[in-house]
Amino acid sequence: MRSRARASSEDGLSGEAIAVATVKLWSDAEAEADARVSAVFADIRATRGSDVVNNFWRGLANDPALLERTWSALKTVMGPGTLDPLTKELVYIAVSIANGCPYCIHSHTAAARAKGLTEGQHGEFLAVVGMANQTNALVNGMQIPIDAAFRVEEGP
């Protein structure tokens, strides 16, 4: 059984902790003392229009190069593109469910709600994810061969 603890501090390190972090979560004061980390944290705040820097980024601050690389890639992938922002968040949630990442499920569900996800849409989305998991398991368990009409061939 996992223990749950309520954490809170002045730098936004708050929330219900399901597990103890295996890495240090940087405070705002620590981030300000490192130019690379401070720059990424400032960009996170500016990009999101929020004073909050999530615990994920605070953990990545232990490796400034990884923090910079990951933030840059996430901004690119989740930024403007062909897919609308809500669809991108829903894909992120589905993958997070498949990977069993509660942190990612919660953070991207919050982001999806901020982008307009309704309770009805959320329920329907979760039903689709659940059905996909069920039918994927059945197909894999039964080793059903792929129909010729479904095969994706390389284009010219």
Explain the meaning of each model-derived region.
Residues M1-P156:
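Hydrophobic alpha-helical segments
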